[in-house]
């Protein structure tokens, strides 16, 4: 189907959108925004967007035909029929001001995603942790089964080489973002909740009960014939289950889970386990991802696929051949250092529970290796709100290099910066962390810290991901002579 044919088909499905031809994104370089933009480009819309810097997302969109502006300016929105904004964009942005003056409709990212989902069979994945991996696994299972879904993911699906794709079927599989409560715009047929923890609490006025109620509201956006797939291992999810008035399928390691994992064993990068489902034969599975937390993510995907009558053979093959997601326990290689060869793994996790899961997976897969973590805290508010939890989890590694907080646009908060966190961990007495005031200093410190056989884990949601790739490209002073790709 050509772009023109697809455009006309969408017009027949959504006649009310017939006058919308040009869509402009403010902050188009983010994974979530860029993913929706990519789908819209491929549906035949004229897409433009702006961001403060060029990146891989903007480069890909340029190749697809989108017009990208580096920097924000009022002129960028002049021809737009609608403007899409991310929550990271300041209301005083010149493009927002210009759109208001021109009376151009301004919608949030989730509202546009909701329109994409309106006439499709939507599968929306929400939760504090595991959204990207779970969404990627579900998309992979549906793809393996020949369902050819449209998907929008918050990270790079390695097998597809992108985080978004326009499929030919009625399925749309997407992450649902609770950070600003915008996931309440979505009206899917299937909703997944992986877990619920205190995060993005500024959105909820610091009220955890409000956060829990918002997840209940999200599940009640399902039609009465929809399905809620929820992780019964999570204490908060279990707590809210009596309040959910929709058909539920539970998953987890718990004995009372509808989709249960048994006989878990991890070896290196891979996990083996048995899945037990009501009314179905047990399946012995190989998952090409490490850690019990990823088995939970796989169980969610299995539950969704089983409910949609996807064949077991597709489930088995998709999990065994899963190629992972960018920055989710991603092996970047083995590298020679002055004191010997080390293994480099990069991970996006930036909440204490995510960091703990990553550490647990590393310990289980490589128990004999010394674990060296370079951690970059993300947001001052998160560091402040979860300060004691960060002290606890970061004390579990063998060697810690702690970078300054990546602000993500926030103003510094006294006592919630990297230096204060480093001092608090040192006072605990288990570890003597090294504070890295500037990301550029990481290259200077690592050669003295790393030892033969270490597992170096770069962790965080800020620009530490770019630093890890510089390491992998041997741009931080490491020798390239012994560089080899790590195979799972």
From Swiss-Prot:
Key word Nucleotide-binding present? yes
Q: Which UniProt keywords apply?
A: ATP-binding, Cell cycle, Cell division, Cell shape, Cell wall biogenesis/degradation, Cytoplasm, Ligase, Nucleotide-binding, Peptidoglycan synthesis
Q: Where does ATP bind?
A: 127-133
Which reactions appear under catalytic activity for this entry? UDP-N-acetyl-alpha-D-muramate + L-alanine + ATP = UDP-N-acetyl-alpha-D-muramoyl-L-alanine + ADP + phosphate + H(+)
Primary localization: cytoplasm
Q: Which Pfam families does this chain map to? A: Mur_ligase (PF01225), Mur_ligase_C (PF02875), Mur_ligase_M (PF08245)
MF GO annotations: ATP binding; UDP-N-acetylmuramate-L-alanine ligase activity
**Enzyme type, top EC level:** ligase
Cellular component annotations (GO), alphabetically ordered: cytoplasm
Q: In which pathway does it act?
A: Cell wall biogenesis; peptidoglycan biosynthesis
Q: Which NCBIfam families match?
A: murC (TIGR01082)
Belongs to which family? Belongs to the MurCDEF family.
Question: What's the protein name?
Answer: UDP-N-acetylmuramate--L-alanine ligase
Task: State the organism named in the record.
Answer: Shewanella sp. (strain MR-7)
């Amino acid at each position: 189907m050509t772009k023109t044919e697809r455009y006309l088909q969408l017009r027949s499905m959504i006649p009310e959108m017939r006058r919308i031809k040009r869509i402009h994104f403010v902050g188009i370089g983010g994974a979530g925004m860029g993913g929706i933009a990519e789908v819209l480009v491929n549906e035949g819309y004229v897409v433009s967007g702006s961001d403060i810097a060029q990146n891989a997302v903007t480069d890909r969109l340029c190749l697809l035909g989108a017009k990208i502006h580096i920097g924000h300016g009022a002129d960028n929105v002049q021809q737009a029929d609608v403007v899409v904004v991310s929550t990271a964009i300041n209301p005083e942005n010149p493009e927002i001001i210009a759109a208001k003056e021109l009376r151009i409709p301004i919608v949030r990212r989730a509202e546009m995603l909701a329109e994409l989902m309106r006439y499709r069979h939507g599968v929306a994945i929400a939760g504090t942790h595991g959204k990207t991996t779970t969404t990627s696994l579900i998309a992979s299972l549906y793809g393996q089964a020949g369902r050819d879904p449209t998907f929008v993911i918050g990270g790079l699906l390695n097998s597809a080489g992108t985080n978004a794709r326009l499929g030919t079927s009625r399925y749309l599989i997407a992450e649902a973002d609770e950070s600003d409560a915008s996931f309440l715009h979505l009206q899917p047929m299937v909703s997944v909740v992986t877990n619920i923890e205190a995060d993005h609490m500024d959105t909820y006025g610091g009220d955890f009960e409000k956060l829990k109620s918002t997840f209940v509201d999200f599940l009640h956006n399902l039609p009465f014939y929809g399905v809620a797939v929820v992780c019964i291992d999570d204490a908060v999810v279990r707590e809210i289950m009596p309040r959910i008035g929709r058909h539920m399928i539970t998953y987890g390691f718990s004995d009372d889970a509808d989709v249960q994992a048994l006989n878990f064993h991890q070896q290196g990068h891979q996990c083996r386990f048995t899945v037990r489902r009501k009314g179905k034969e047990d399946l012995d599975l190989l998952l090409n991802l490490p850690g019990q937390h990823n088995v939970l993510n796989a169980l969610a995907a299995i539950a969704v696929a089983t409910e949609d009558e996807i064949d077991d053979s597709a489930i088995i093959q998709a999990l065994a051949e899963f190629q992972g997601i960018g920055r989710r326990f991603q092996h970047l290689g083995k590298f020679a250092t002055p004191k010997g060869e080390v293994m480099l793994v990069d991970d996006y996790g930036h909440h204490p529970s995510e960091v703990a899961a990553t550490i647990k997976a590393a310990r289980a897969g490589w128990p004999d290796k010394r674990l060296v973590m370079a951690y970059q805290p993300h947001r001052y508010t998160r560091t402040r709100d979860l300060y004691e939890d960060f002290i606890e989890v970061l004390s579990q590694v063998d060697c810690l290099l702690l970078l300054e907080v990546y602000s993500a646009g926030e103003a510094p908060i006294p006592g919630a910066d990297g230096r204060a966190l480093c001092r608090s961990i040192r006072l605990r007495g288990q570890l003597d962390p090294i504070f890295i005031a500037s990301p550029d200093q990481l290259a200077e410190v690592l050669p003295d810290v790393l030892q033969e056989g270490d597992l170096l884990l770069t962790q965080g949601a800020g620009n530490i991901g770019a630093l890890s790739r510089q390491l992998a490209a041997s741009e931080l002073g490491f020798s390239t002579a012994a560089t080899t790709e790590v195979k799972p």
